[in-house]
Amino acid sequence: MWTASKLSIATLIAVGSMLSVGSFAQDNEYVEEVVSIGTRGKPRSVSSSPVPVDVLSSEDISKTGTDDLLLQLQGSVPSLNVHLQPISDAASMIRPANLRGLSADSTLITVNGKRRHHASVIAFQGGGVNDGSQGADISVIPAIALKRVEVLRDGASAQYGSDAIAGVINFVLDDISEGGSLSYKMGEYTEGDGATSTISGKYGMPLGQDGFVTTSFQIRQADDTSRSAQRPDAAALIAAGNSAVANPAQIWGAPKIDDDVTFFMNSGVMNSDGSESYMFGNYSERDVDGGFYYRNPDGRSGVFTIGDYRAVGNVD
């Protein structure tokens, strides 16, 4: 009896230990993010990737407190910098984003894993690394249309080509098949300028039994900002009686943005053979009014003269 009782007690202790270990493992179970960028093989988890990859969910992006996707990414991705570009020609309208200190066209931009075309703007007069670069326009992608953003912060030109020297940013569009959301944001700077209002939304619909159609939109208005001081030469013209000179004559700040409208659509359906048919696209437009360098008529004698006659001599 003593031996049997001892064996029974030992068996119970062993079984109890096994159950507690199993319960502990189940409580700490988690699912890793799987990414496909930065590897030639099959998709792998972030922790097993041989290169630095950041995965940002739509919730992570929305926590930054701004409605500008460029600024949202700058606040979430290490080594990604985006600058306001006052008086930088068209770069004031399509702001370049720099990953790892390299030019905007050194970062490959993809949407759903497909290469995004470059913008029509060549950055000019902004100075620094972006002069002459022609990157993709990230600002046309509304944050509400995204499921997640994958950022490869390492050179990948051997895999993707020379436009991935700085890395790769892959925007994965949301693929909901029902429901949606609507949001409205507004704000301004403490100086009292730069008032911004944004309304955005998305809605998902089923496509057959195994498909989806997700549509999203964003409408944004932004007033300009100015941190300018009057130029001395413009102030001298005003003092001389020229009332046509603006104050300030040259504006340094963010441009005014009107009717910034963006629409995105993402759809997909599973075929009977296991393959997937998909389609996505976008439409966007906006009007931008920004400042430029001041042309002093008093110092442009080669332009405002006809022979020895000064064409602007009597301008008030």
Region spans (language model):
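N-terminal periplasmic "start-of-domain" segments of outer-membrane beta-barrel proteins
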Residues: 33-64, 91, 120-131, 180
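N-terminal periplasmic accessory domains that precede
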Residues: 69-72, 76, 97, 110, ...
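Short, polar/charged loop or turn motifs at beta-strand boundaries
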Residues: 49-74, 96-102, 133-139, 186-190, ...
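Non-catalytic regulatory/gating segments with a bias toward low-complexity or hydrophobic composition
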Residues: 53, 61, 73, 149, ...
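Extracytoplasmic beta-strand/coil segments of soluble accessory domains associated
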Residues: 74-119
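Outer-envelope beta-barrel architecture signal
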Residues: 69, 107, 176-180, 209-213, ...
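Short acidic/polar hinge/loop motifs at secondary-structure boundaries
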Residues: 114-153, 307, 313
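Transmembrane beta-barrel wall of Gram-negative outer-membrane proteins
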Residues: 191-316
